[in-house]
A protein has these predicted regions:
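Flexible, non-catalytic linker and terminal segments flanking ANL/adenylate-forming cores
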Residues: 1-19
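A short N-terminal helical cap/helix-turn-helix that marks the beginning
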Residues: 16-38
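Conserved pre-ATP/AMP-binding loop-to-beta segment of ANL
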Residues: 34, 147, 160-162, 169-191
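Conserved AMP-binding/adenylate-forming core of the ANL superfamily
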Residues: 35-80, 84-88, 105-110, 160, ...
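Conserved AMP-binding A3 loop
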Residues: 47-49, 187-197
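Structural core segment of the AMP-binding/adenylate-forming
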Residues: 64-65, 92-169
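Conserved G/P- and acidic residue-centered "switch" motifs that form tight phosphate/ATP-binding loops
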Residues: 73, 94, 195
Length: 197
């Protein structure tokens, strides 16, 4: 994790390394509210049980792609179910979620991919041109693209990449989530968009 190399003076202390994680929230919700609606997008509906299952399959699918603990998985997605699932599914395989602002230019996207060392990127079909242009500018190969079609917004799959649904279908619903050992394990990696002044 090259982006952590600049952090100093953050030694583990009793107050800062206990195992606290938001991953347990969804597991609890799936047990307490199994049939309650958790996600709504267009005609898509998912209960908390289904939401948990989809996150588990995402974690398993990513693990099958070789994503391991500490690897970065980027997303360029609007507010759709795949983004909500990424918030749990990516950390559930031990990886670090890197949500990238969809309004960024190709140079900034390339910088974030490179600096964050993204191994995989979940990309909405509408953002493929920006991501492909960003990867073309990179000296490294860039992340593996998993395409997230959005039929509700009239963005069908391009046919050039493995789709998000195919990744979920490849996942194991019995995959054991990899919970953080302590608070020092990264869950997310965020970059400013330059809008904070």
């Amino acid at each position: 994790m090259g982006w952590m190399k600049d952090e100093t003076g953050l030694d583990k202390r009793d107050a800062n390394y206990r195992a606290l994680t938001p991953l347990s929230h969804l597991r609890r919700a799936a047990k307490v509210f199994p049939k309650k609606t958790a996600l709504v997008y267009g005609d898509f509906r998912a209960s908390y049980t289904q939401y948990h299952d989809r996150c588990t399959r995402l974690a398993s699918g990513l693990a099958q792609l070789g994503v391991t603990s500490g690897d970065v998985v980027a997303t360029l997605l609007p507010n759709i179910p795949a983004q909500a699932e990424a918030h749990f599914g990516i950390p559930a395989c031990g990886a670090v979620l890197n949500t990238i602002n969809t309004r960024l230019d190709k140079g900034t996207i390339a910088y974030i991919f490179d600096h964050g060392e993204a191994k995989v990127a979940l990309v909405d079909t509408q953002f493929l041109p920006s991501v492909e242009a960003a990867i073309a500018e990179m000296e490294s190969d860039g992340p593996l693209i998993i395409e997230v079609p959005d039929a509700a917004a009239d963005y069908p799959a391009s046919g050039r990449y493995q789709t998000y649904d195919a990744l979920l279908e490849s996942g194991d619903a019995a995959f054991e989530w990899i919970m953080p050992a302590d608070e020092w394990e990264s869950l997310a990696l965020n970059y400013t968009s330059g809008t904070t002044g």
